[in-house]
């Protein structure tokens, strides 16, 4: 089935008010196909800023993280209600940097995913293996374990986009080949079909999140199970528009 091409831009802890204005205005003036969905994730301090500047119907805004409580004494965290209140519609959960630097477990990410979905935002759920896990040949075992934790808590995947991000490729300039990515994405979809249903799995978009850029994005064009990209550093640059248009 035809799934809407999806491009996520994760700004990470980068950007200023001025630079984010420049990025959003670049998107506003760009020619973006009507059948592409774009989601940008600026730092939390600039969510409101990005939402207010955005003029494109195909573009929406995501938070890079959210906590699993509605409110309370959780210094430094952002609630889903606060994210929604400023007009953001998505949240990125399970990113490898959250798993690695902030020690977020599969179960904790699953709990956050369920809470976010129940609270009315859509989720970009990140999964992926480290270099050590890749070298051991356990990539599929790792991503299935990460998915199973969420499957145990979430039955309705309508508002979930899965992002496969090989950790060894993030910020390193390394990237899986488009054939490698297709093989893993296909296995992920087969796993979801087994656990949910074939029809449900066919509707879930699976993004590639390993150092996608303006040059390599086009090589994924004919890969049936690669439904878009979760872009890191390149989302801060003009080439982000090239990635968005890589399937035109």
UniProtKB/Swiss-Prot annotation:
Q: Name one GO biological process term.
A: glycerol catabolic process
Q: Which InterPro entries match?
A: Aldolase_TIM, TIM_sf, TrioseP_Isoase_bac/euk, Triosephosphate_isomerase, Triosephosphate_isomerase_AS
Enzyme Commission number(s) from the entry: 5.3.1.1
Molecular function GO labels? triose-phosphate isomerase activity
* Keywords noted in UniProt: Gluconeogenesis, Glycolysis, Isomerase
List ligand-binding residues for substrate: 10, 12
What's an example GO cellular component term for this entry? cytosol
- Active site feature: 95, 165
- Name the reaction it catalyses: D-glyceraldehyde 3-phosphate = dihydroxyacetone phosphate
* Keyword Isomerase part of the UniProt annotation: yes
Pathway annotation: Carbohydrate biosynthesis; gluconeogenesis; Carbohydrate degradation; glycolysis; D-glyceraldehyde 3-phosphate from glycerone phosphate: step 1/1
Checking HAMAP family in the record gives:
TIM_B
PANTHER family membership? TRIOSEPHOSPHATE ISOMERASE (PTHR21139:SF41)
Family note: Belongs to the triosephosphate isomerase family.
Q: How does it assemble?
A: Homodimer.
Question: What is the name of the protein in this document?
Answer: Triosephosphate isomerase
Q: Which organism is it from?
A: Kluyveromyces marxianus (Yeast)
């Amino acid at each position: 089935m035809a799934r809407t091409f999806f491009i996520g831009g994760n700004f990470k802890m980068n950007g200023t008010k001025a630079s984010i204005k420049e990025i959003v205005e670049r998107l506003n003036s760009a020619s973006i196909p009507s059948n592409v969905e774009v989601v940008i994730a600026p730092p939390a301090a600039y969510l409101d800023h990005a939402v207010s500047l955005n003029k494109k119907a195909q573009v929406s805004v995501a938070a890079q993280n959210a906590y699993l409580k509605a409110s309370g004494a959780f210094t430094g965290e952002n609630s889903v209600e606060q994210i929604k209140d400023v007009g953001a519609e998505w949240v990125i959960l399970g990113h490898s940097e959250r798993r690695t630097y902030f020690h977020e477990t599969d179960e904790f990410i699953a709990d956050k995913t369920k809470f976010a979905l129940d609270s009315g935002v859509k989720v970009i759920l990140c999964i992926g293996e480290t270099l050590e896990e890749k070298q051991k040949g356990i990539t599929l075992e790792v991503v299935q374990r990460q998915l199973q934790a969420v499957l145990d808590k979430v039955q309705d995947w309508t508002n979930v986009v899965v992002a496969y991000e090989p950790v060894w490729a993030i910020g390193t300039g390394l990237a899986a080949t488009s054939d490698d990515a297709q093989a893993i994405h296909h296995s992920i979809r087969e796993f979801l079909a087994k656990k949910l249903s074939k029809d449900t799995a066919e509707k879930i978009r699976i993004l590639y999140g390993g150092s996608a850029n303006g040059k390599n994005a086009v090589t994924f064009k004919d890969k049936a199970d690669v439904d878009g990209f979760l872009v890191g550093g390149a989302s801060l640059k003009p080439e982000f528009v090239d990635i968005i248009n890589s399937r035109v």
